[in-house]
């Protein structure tokens, strides 16, 4: 499975790691899992340092629209994306611009910096 994730309800944190060929369907499956776990408001880290994105501009626009549609479900927690490769980093930046949802979102090249930033974000779960 290209995206594996863990939801920690006690710490209100979702950690996702993408590996291999990353497609739209993989990310949609992850998002479905987050919604099903009632974890939209949790802090999230999405590590795509081991993934090769196979996402078109249309795919990124569809993901952005999906994230914006989640706003009606309640608060959306902060997101740290870790992407080191040029294409991954570029697509992460495009996703961040398209998925504006009144929440902090930041892109990092190093996992420990992403985690440090995410840990400094306030809990928005109420």
Model region roles, listed by residue range:
Residues 1-126:
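Amphipathic, Lys/Arg-enriched alpha-helical "gate/interface" segment within cytosolic domains
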């Amino acid at each position: 499975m290209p995206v594996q994730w863990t939801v920690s309800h006690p710490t209100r944190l979702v950690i996702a790691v993408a590996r291999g060929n990353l497609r739209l369907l993989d990310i949609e499956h992850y998002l479905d899992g987050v919604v099903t776990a009632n974890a939209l408001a949790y802090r999230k880290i999405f590590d795509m340092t081991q993934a090769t994105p196979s996402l078109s501009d249309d795919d990124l626009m569809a993901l952005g629209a999906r994230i914006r549609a989640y706003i009606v479900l309640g608060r959306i927690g902060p997101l740290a994306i870790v992407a080191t490769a040029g294409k991954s980093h570029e697509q992460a930046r495009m996703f961040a611009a398209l998925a504006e949802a009144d929440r902090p979102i930041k892109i990092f090249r190093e996992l420990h910096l992403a985690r440090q930033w995410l840990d400094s974000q306030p809990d928005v779960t109420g």
